[in-house]
Amino acid sequence: SAASDVYKRQALGLYLFINLIFIVKYGLRVSPLVVILGIVLFLTLVLGIFKLYNNRFVDKNIVWLLLIFAVFSYCLTLFVPLESLNVDRWQIITCFCNAVENGEYPYLSHPENIPENLPGPSPFYFVLSYPFYKLNFFEGIPLAASFLWYFCLPFKSRKNRVLTTLLLLISPVYIYEIMVRSTIITNSLIILIWATYFVRFGRWNASTVFFNALLFGMLLNTRNVFIIPVLIYGVYYVCRKQTQMKILWWSFVSIIFFLSLYALLAAVWGVENVLEYNPFRVQSEMIIPAWLSVTIVFIAVVAGAFVKKSENIVFYSCLIFFISAFSTYLWTSFHDESFSYAYLEHFDITYFLFSYTFALYLIKPEICIKVRL
C-alpha cells in the first residue's frame, strides 16, 4: 500500500540519518576529511548491499559473515581498553553488580571518576548484564545483537533477513556500540523481538497471555523508555472490544512482575532507599525533565489510538523513539544555549539508537530496488 511504502522510505531515511550523525560527530574529533571519507564509504557500502544482498554466495554464507564479523570486531576491541573509554555503561554495570555482591544498595553506587552518575536502567537490565560482568566480557553484549537479529527476529522473507543483517553489520553506529561496549542496540532489539511476536496477541489464550505478560514485565524492567511500544500496543488492543479483557489481564500480570524486583530491593535495602534513589528519579533529574517524559507518554497513547493495523505498531514505536531522542536533544540545546555544543559535546546521541533498531527492521527489499533505479 501507499502508506506502507511511506513507512519503509521513512525507515530507510532514519537508518541513514542516525548513522550519518554518528559519522559527523565522532569524525570531527579527528578531522573534516575523516567525516567526508566516512560518509562516502558508508553510502558506498549501503548501495553495494542494495545490489548484492540477493547474491547467492552472500545468501549462502551469511552465517560465516556473522562469525567473521564477530571475531574481527572482538579483535578490534582489544586495541580499545575499557579504561580509555568515556562511555561509562560498562562501569555502571560493574558498580551496580559490585554493590549487590557487597550487600550495598546498588542505586547509590557510581564510578569513582563520575560520582554524580548514578545507575539509570531498571533492575532487570543488570540481571541480563550479570553473566557478562562475571566473565568480564562486556564486548559480548553488543556482539550478541547481530546473532539475535539474524536468528530470532521474524521476517516475511529470507531476502529481508539477509538485507537487514548486512545493513546492521556495516552500520557505524553498531561498530561504535561494540567498540565502547554499549548495550542500547541489544536491549532495544530484545524489545523489538518481543514486539514482533506480540502482534499475535489477539489469537492467544489466557495462559499464553500470562506468560507473555511475565516475560514483558521483566523486559520493561530494563529501561523505562520501553514503555513507548507498550503504550502503543496497549491502546491499540484496548480499542478492539474482542481483546479488552485480555489486555487488562496482560497489564495486571505485567505490572506485578515489573514491580517485583523493586519490591525485592525494598525488602533487602528498605523502602526509603528505593523511594529516594531509583531509575525513575535518576532519569527525570539527570536525562530529561519529568514534563517531557509525560509529553512523550501522551504522544505514545495518542499514536496507539491512530494505529489501523498491528503491523504498523513497530513504525509508530520507531517514530516516537526518534521524537523522544530529538526532543531530548532540543531540551539539552536550549539548556546549553548552543545547538552545536549540545550535539558535539554534551548530548548523548546514542538515545537515537532505540529508534535505529526499529527503523532497520522496517527496511524492505522492494525499497532497495527503487533506490537502485
Kindly label every feature range from the protein language model.
Residues 65-139:
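Intramembrane catalytic core of multi-pass membrane enzymes that act on lipidic substrates
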Residues 18-23, 246-332:
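Membrane-lumen/periplasm interface segments of specific transmembrane helices
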Residues 130, 172, 208-224, 229-235, ...:
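Membrane-interface alpha helices of multi-pass inner-membrane proteins
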Residues 1-7:
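Short, small-residue-biased leader/transition segments that mark boundaries at the very start
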Residues 229-255:
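Perimembrane helix-loop-helix junctions
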Residues 138-162:
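Transmembrane-helix motifs of polytopic, lipid-linked glycan transferases
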